[in-house]
A protein has these predicted regions:
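NTP-dependent small-molecule kinase module
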Residues: 2-11, 36, 147-210
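A glycine- and Lys/Arg-enriched "phosphate-lid" helix/loop adjacent to the NTP-binding pocket
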Residues: 106, 111-174
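P-loop (Walker A) phosphate-binding loop of NTP-binding proteins
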Residues: 23
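Conserved lysine of the Walker
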Residues: 28
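Hydrophobic anchor at the beta1->P-loop junction of P-loop NTPases
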Residues: 20
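ATP-dependent small-molecule kinase phosphotransfer cores
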Residues: 44-131
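Pre-Walker A (Motif I) flank of P-loop NTPase domains
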Residues: 13-17
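Hydrophobic positions on the alpha1 helix immediately C-terminal to the Walker A/P-loop
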Residues: 31
Length: 210
């Protein structure tokens, strides 16, 4: 397990890793950008990203899901783990060691929820990831009702992918709800964008002093 609090070898103080989690339609990408803007206004260097990435391993999962024909669960897990290994090695850890904050739209908690809802063992997924992946300083679970999630996805006008049926999203939400990590915080995300951002700012202030 990579300790998020470990000291960097660089002259910079180590940055912080903040990840945004939740089912589709919760507004994660919007809140990533709002927090990034706030942190930059405080003079903090910020790197934003998302998972699965646009690298070859992440795109295999994305393209199969958008085609409505998911990979097998074993193939998904293998691709997602390799995608994350490269992301940690090439982007996340170098940025943190340089003193930058990293904000991610999805991380390995999504894998626990989504592949867990597909039948994989949730705790095994956590163990596989934490064997190499940086543990977040703060994870923000943006929680909304399933009905609102589907309304928002419909309003976006994007075609449904293989992960977006109501029963599956309900199972994912149940797994998120059962997660117990001291750095995981639930955010009620069915309010306005500004209301959700205010909750996030409060958590970041309490946990990271910013």
């Amino acid at each position: 397990m990579v300790n998020p609090a470990m000291e960097s070898d660089s002259p910079h103080l180590r940055g912080s890793l903040v990840v945004f989690e939740g089912i589709d339609g919760t507004g994660k990408s919007t809140q990533v950008e709002l927090l990034a803007r706030y942190l930059r206004s405080r003079g903090i260097e910020v790197v934003t990203g998302f998972e699965p990435t646009r690298g070859p391993w992440g795109m295999r999962v994305r393209e199969a899901a958008m085609a409505g024909d998911r990979l097998s669960i074993d193939e998904e897990i293998a691709c997602l783990l390799q995608d994350r290994r490269e992301h940690v090695r090439e982007v996340i850890e170098p940025s943190l060691q340089a003193g930058k904050w990293v904000l991610l739209d999805r991380y390995y908690l999504s894998m626990m929820a989504y592949q867990g809802a597909s039948g994989a063992n949730v705790e095994e997924i956590r163990e596989w990831n934490e064997a190499f992946a940086t543990v977040p300083d703060v994870a923000l679970w943006l929680d909304i009702p399933i009905e609102l999630s589907q309304e928002r996805m419909h309003a976006r006008g994007n075609g449904k992918d293989a992960f977006e049926n109501e029963k599956f999203l309900s199972d994912c939400a149940a797994i998120y709800s059962a997660m117990e990590m001291p750095w995981l915080h639930r955010v009620e995300a069915d309010g306005t964008v500004d209301e959700v951002h205010a909750q996030i700012r409060e958590i970041i202030q309490e946990e990271l002093g910013i």
